[in-house]
Each structure stands twice: as C-alpha cells, then as structure tokens.
Amino acid sequence: MTRREILLAGLAGWLGHRRLRADQAPQPSQINFDVPSGACDCHTHIFGDPRKFPFFAGRVYTPPPALPEEMATLHRALHIQRVVIVTPSVYGTDNSATLYGMKARGRDARGVAVIDEKTPEHELDSMDRAGVRGVRLNLTTSGIADPKTGRDRFAAAVERVQRRGWHVQMNTNPAMIAAIKDLAASSPVPVVFDHFGGARADGGPSQPGFADLVELVRSGRAYVKLSGAYRALSAPSQAPDVLLLAQTLIAANPDRILWGTDWPHPDSAPWPGRKP
C-alpha cells in the first residue's frame, strides 16, 4: 500500500466506529490492512490517577484515567510500534503524566510538552533527555482567537525550542492558521497542526483558512495531523465530509501528513441519541 492508501484506510477505519470514552471502549478488533513496520501513532494522551497527576483548575473537561498499559493493548492490536504522547490541556503546563507514559512505553515513545514563559530552561533540558521533541500551543482550549496573541505565542514558542531542534505543534483553527501563515512559512523549526487544523467537516475545503493550511502543507512548510476526526463533526452523517478534508490534505502533499488515533479520544462522548 502507498502512504496515501494507508492514511485513508486508517481514517476510514475510525469513521466506521462511534465515539466512546476510554473506560467504555470494547477490546480493539483486528485490522484488515497491512501496517508498515515501525508504524507510529503520532497523537495520543495519557491521563493518570488524578491523585498522583492532578488536573489543571482551568480545564474545560475532566477525563477518566487512560493508562499506558491500556494504550499498549490498542497498539498491539493495530501493529503499531512507536508513539507520540502529547500533553493534553487538562494538565496545563504540568507534563508529568506525559513523561510517565513515555517512561512506561520505553524507547519507542516520544513526547510533546506544554510550556509557558515561566518554564525554566533546565526543565526543557530534562524533558529533552526524556524524549520530548516538541511543544504544543493549546490555543483552541485556551479560548485564544485574537490573531496578534496567536502570532505572539507562536513566535515565543519558536524562540524557546529552536536551539533544541524541537517542533511547534498547534491546536487551533483555520482562521488562526491564516493569521500566522507567514510565520509558519518562514519558521526555522518544523510546524505541526493538530486535528485537521481545526477544520469543520460541514465547512468543506472552501471554508475560510483551509486553503492556507493546504498551501502550507503543499509547500512542505507545515505538517498536519489526521487525528481526532470526531472533533470536526457535529453529526455522524458528516463522516463523508471529513473524509473529503483528509483527501484534500493528502493530495496536497502526502509526505506532510501525520496520523494519530487521538487515543483515548478526550472530551468525546457517544453521539446524541445513541447509547454507549
């Protein structure tokens, strides 16, 4: 299978399943296509015991535990060897749960941290030694829509990570991508956009800002994750629409497309009217 075919097969497999929380999910079923050796799930989260890994007071959702051994069970069924664990917004700038998950997984794990201007350099150095290779800007969950604020946050993140060779990852939307397009295009570090760049399925490829994302991907100046497809949907009938977004991005540049399960699908719930 080509890279394009593998990406679409992975997405199609997700679209065939409803959304369930980690504690409601059945055992994973076996896949029906070949997975490349060394395959990587590029977007996952770990939620530890809240008594040991307390949540950020300003969080917008409260997830149930999702532990490294549960994720490993899924990855064995999917024949996935490597993983990227991303610090979710519910922990603020506390990356302890991510580091815990990376340590449990071992050398096949890498991490993406969340930091701010108060994060000391020695902490970044320590995370680098542990396998962190990027920082995430949670603009969407922080309610940041102002273009100037977004540009300032992006520039500050680039400055912090440049000497380490890390990347900057953004959880945002197409409007913000359009606002920072010039910065992303000239960035000295790799730029990654989460979850289809925050595009909405019902907006289609013509929605404002999506063309800017496509252009960044086509030019090789940014990566985009085909992850968290459920986030783009407001109804299950929109599944073909999110598939069209994926096809548009893959056609632009398959070498700048990343795939992730978004396990354990945080802030998700069964569709209204459907029982778990």
Predicted regions and their residues:
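Alpha-helical scaffolding within the catalytic cores
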Residues: 67-70, 94, 119-122, 177-178, ...
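Active-site gating/metal-coordination segments in enzymes
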Residues: 90-175, 182-185, 218, 223-240
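An N-terminally biased module of ancient metal coordination in phosphate/nucleic-acid-related enzymes
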Residues: 6-7, 23-93
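Hydrophobic faces of well-ordered beta-strands that scaffold small-molecule active sites
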Residues: 40-44, 83-85, 111-113, 135-137, ...
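Histidine/lysine/aspartate-rich catalytic loop segments that bind and position anionic ligands
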Residues: 189, 193-201
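Active-site phosphate/pyrophosphate- and oxyanion-stabilizing loops and adjacent acidic/basic residues
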Residues: 72, 99-100, 178-181, 214, ...
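H/E-rich (His + Asp/Glu) clusters that bind or coordinate divalent metals
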Residues: 13, 20-30, 206-276
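N-terminal secretory signal peptides and thylakoid transit peptides that target proteins
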Residues: 1-13
